[in-house]
Amino acid sequence: MRFAILSPIYPYRGGIAQFSGMLYTELVKEGHEVKAFNFKRLYPDILFPGKTQYVEAGDRAIEIESVRVLDSVNPVSYFSTVNAIRSYAPDVLIISYWMSFFVPGYAHVANRMKKHCKVITLIHNAIPHEPRFFDKPLASLLFKQCHGFIVMSDNVRYDLRKLYPGAKYIQNPHPLYNHFGSKINKNEACRNPSVQKESSILWTDTGL
């Protein structure tokens, strides 16, 4: 089967990009043909509070080749993205969704592609933890363009069904990230100069 993935992916950093790299890799391992369609601009600099949006030297990243075509704030690129994906002629288009900021581009692509292939949205977060007035209607706009959904938690499933009661979805647990290297024991870790033996690590559930 031929898959297209529309998502931030390498050289972007962050959980969504890494997840999409894992998804790409696993689909290829299963014998599928896969092509990644990436953002050429994810966030405008004025809206990005961090140091960089990109992988830096020393970061562990899954390096995936991609077509960098979608600009989140340039509507002209929405048409270019549709053309690029249509020329690839996928059987399935998977869209990574986690924030309503990207709905204008995503919804345009989904609407234009749904007559040509199955459009599946992989939802990392349907509604933000602190929603703004436009988050729900924008998410609904995108979801109504899709044939089906993948969710990875009960909370996201609940939000999806609330926003789009007729949604067809499957639910699978969020996989563990596997690109950080092999597990090592405590004593070996403590021999690392950057790790203090007396230090303690507090694990918290942030909902991310």
Each predicted region: which residue ranges?
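A short, glycine/small-residue-rich beta-strand->loop->alpha-helix junction that serves as a flexible
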Residues: 7-21, 44, 98-103
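N-terminal strand-loop element at the rim of the active site
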Residues: 11-13, 25-87, 156, 161
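Membrane-proximal helix-turn-helix segments that form the acceptor-binding/catalytic region
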Residues: 111-112, 132-149
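An aromatic- and histidine-rich active-site surface loop
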Residues: 75-81, 93-116
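A short, histidine- and acid-enriched strand-loop-helix "catalytic/donor-clamping" loop
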Residues: 98-102, 117-133, 147-148
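Acidic anion/phosphate-binding donor-loop and adjacent secondary structure
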Residues: 132, 158-163, 175-193
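Conserved donor-binding/catalytic core segment of Leloir-type glycosyltransferases
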Residues: 192-208
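Short beta-strand->alpha-helix junction loop in the catalytic core
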Residues: 42, 156, 172-182, 204-208
